[in-house]
């Protein structure tokens, strides 16, 4: 089975002249890249290449990294705009009932009556709560608050989100 890679950061720009890269992390609280997992770089031209992080250091709201074989500013500049992806199996294990956003993307969203409402396009974090952005066939997307009032269960393994109600959503 092929490894599944999950985007965790973008290469914002080179840093200095020795090939260091400044990453814009999708989750600033995550320390996943500090553990130097294997990474896959998805380049702006659509190609991808595997890479190895050899050094990291947090700075401001970003992370500076050195990647094996990237030894000067020109080589670093060639990676500007690349997406940094990490194998899903490198993520920390979760407790019962917890899931990572990447694990529910594409999941079927079922109405309380058992009908298919749509599929999860993404998970957005807002100050008051997280919401599932649900893409519906032939209709506008909707945002479903990820609260017990609206979502009765999330089965990331089976890729099913069961809604408790449609009231206020459609």
From Swiss-Prot:
Superkingdom: Bacteria
Keywords assigned by UniProt, alphabetized: Chaperone, Cytoplasm, Ribosome biogenesis, rRNA processing
SUPFAM superfamilies, per the entry: PRC-barrel domain, Translation proteins
GO CC entries: cytoplasm; ribosome
Record-level GO BP terms: ribosomal small subunit biogenesis; rRNA processing
Chief site of localization: cytoplasm
Chain ranges of the PRC barrel domain: 96-169
Keyword rRNA processing on entry: yes
GO terms of molecular function: ribosome binding
Compartments reported by the entry: Cytoplasm
Quaternary structure and partners: Binds ribosomal protein uS19.
Protein family membership: Belongs to the RimM family.
Known role: An accessory protein needed during the final step in the assembly of 30S ribosomal subunit, possibly for assembly of the head region. Essential for efficient processing of 16S rRNA. May be needed both before and after RbfA during the maturation of 16S rRNA. It has affinity for free ribosomal 30S subunits but not for 70S ribosomes.
Domain notes: The PRC barrel domain binds ribosomal protein uS19.
Entry protein name: Ribosome maturation factor RimM
Record organism: Sorangium cellulosum (strain So ce56) (Polyangium cellulosum (strain So ce56))
């Amino acid at each position: 089975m092929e490894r599944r890679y999950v985007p965790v950061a973008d290469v914002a720009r080179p840093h200095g002249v020795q090939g260091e890269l400044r990453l814009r992390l999708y989750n600033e609280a995550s320390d996943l890249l500090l553990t130097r997992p294997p990474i896959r770089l998805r380049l702006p031209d659509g190609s991808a290449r595997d890479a190895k992080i050899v050094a990291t250091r947090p700075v401001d709201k970003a992370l500076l990294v050195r990647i094996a074989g990237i030894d000067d500013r020109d080589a670093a500049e060639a990676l500007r705009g690349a997406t940094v992806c990490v194998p899903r199996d490198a993520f920390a294990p979760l407790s019962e009932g917890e899931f990572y956003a990447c694990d529910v993307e594409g999941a079927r969203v079922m109405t309380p009556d058992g009908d298919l409402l749509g599929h999860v396009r993404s998970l957005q974090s807002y100050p008051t709560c997280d919401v599932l952005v649900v893409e519906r066939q032939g209709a506008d997307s909707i945002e479903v608050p990820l609260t017990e009032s609206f979502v009765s269960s999330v089965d990331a393994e089976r890729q099913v989100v069961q809604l408790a109600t449609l009231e206020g959503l459609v």
